[in-house]
Amino acid sequence: MKQKTVLSIAGSDCSGGAGIQADLKTMVMNGVYGMSVITALTAQNTTGVRAIQEVTPDFLQQQLDAVFQDIDPLAVKIGMVPTGDLMHVIADRLRYYQAKNVVVDPVMVASAGSSLMKQNAVQTLVRELLPIATLVTPNIPEAQVLSGMTIANKEDMIGAAKKIGDSYHCAVLLKGGHSINDANDLLYANGELVWFAGKRIDNPNTHGTGCTLSSAIASNLAKGFTLAEAIQRAKAYISGALAAMLDLGQGSGPMMHNFDLQGEWTVSK
């Protein structure tokens, strides 16, 4: 059986709601074989991030080489990368291996508000990672940093998406879930704008939504769907995961990634 393969390059969330844990759950549910290269270990839960331990650039490169020299991923999702040195290694290795379908989720702040990227790393992000991206998926706060613009409405979203895409020559999916009154997302690709309508789901447990969306998009790109199709399918998946209303933890809890998993092996005694 020929299996589609996707690599997540991201941090580890010991509580399981975000990071590589969310990515791998999402990949399984979207029908691909998931692999992970860890950029950092985090001690976090639904209430916040307590500590971050970055890997060394050398160990990061060894992980990347180990994956690409054995199982070539058909898509790559990049999530939390806390330092510019680590971003440089990722960009270098992805160029070397001519990585395909690179989806960059520019994770800067955790759902609970903790910073996940060092401030001086943003310049490395825009200089080295965005130019090799097929798609970048910022939320409103991240798009404001990347574009240098204030985003208060849909017209601002259009302006910011165009500025990011034209500046770094990548497609942009600007997620409207932060501070805009609906869950509509905007794709800017090849000079064209496409809105993806989304019904806002009244669920306070949104830990890992960005990780999940970008991983689902990468999974669908690996399966051969167009960019627009991959986004639509990913949004449908994340809506189902949110609508399942999983309630875990004392803060902003995780989604139910396996909401549509059925089979005798899932039944509890």
Predicted regions and their residues:
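Short pre-catalytic strand/loop immediately N-terminal to key active-site residues, enriched for Gly-Thr
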Residues: 9-15, 193-207
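Conserved N-terminal subdomain of the carbohydrate kinase-like
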Residues: 2-8, 28-104, 108-111
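Charged C-terminal helix
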Residues: 54, 228-269
